[in-house]
Amino acid sequence: MVEQTWVIHWEGPFTLEEGKKKKVKRSGYVLYQLSGQHHLYGANVLLYIGQTSKGIKTRLGQHDTWIAEEYDEMEVRLGSIAKFSSWRSFEKTTKPFRNPGRRIVEKIEKLLIFACQTAYNVANKNDVKDAEEIRIFNTGHCGPIFPEISSWYFLDQ
C-alpha cells in the first residue's frame, strides 16, 4: 500500500459557545479539538479530539456535563481535511475543505488521538490499526497538536 498524505486545516480558537454556532454541514469541518486547563498537565493542554458528524452543536453539547466541571474555559478548534498533493496547491485551495468521507475521517481521528494521547479520549487510543500508511499535516491555527503526524513514526511500521 502507498502512504496517503492528508492536510487538516484548523480554525479557531473559539469559545464553546462560538464553536456551537459554526455551521458544520455546509462548512466541511469534520473534526474538533478541545483544549484547556488540566489539573496534572497544566494550561493549554489538548484534552479531546472528536468528529463533528452529528453536528458541532450536538457533539459539543454531549460534552457539557464534564466541561462544566473543568477549571477554566475550554477552547474549540475546528478542522477540515483534504488530500495533500503539494504546498503550492494547498495555498490556492479554498478553506475549509469539503468533507473527504466518513472512512478517512475515522482513520485520521484515530491516528490523531493515538499520536497526541489526549487526556480525555478513551476510545480510539488503542484502536489505530486501520490508520496505517497515513501522514497528516496540521495547518492553520493548530493549537497544542503536532504539526506533522505519520503512522510510520507513531505505529512503527
What residues fall within each predicted segment?
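Boundary/linker segments flanking structured domains
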Residues: M1-L47, Q51-Q157
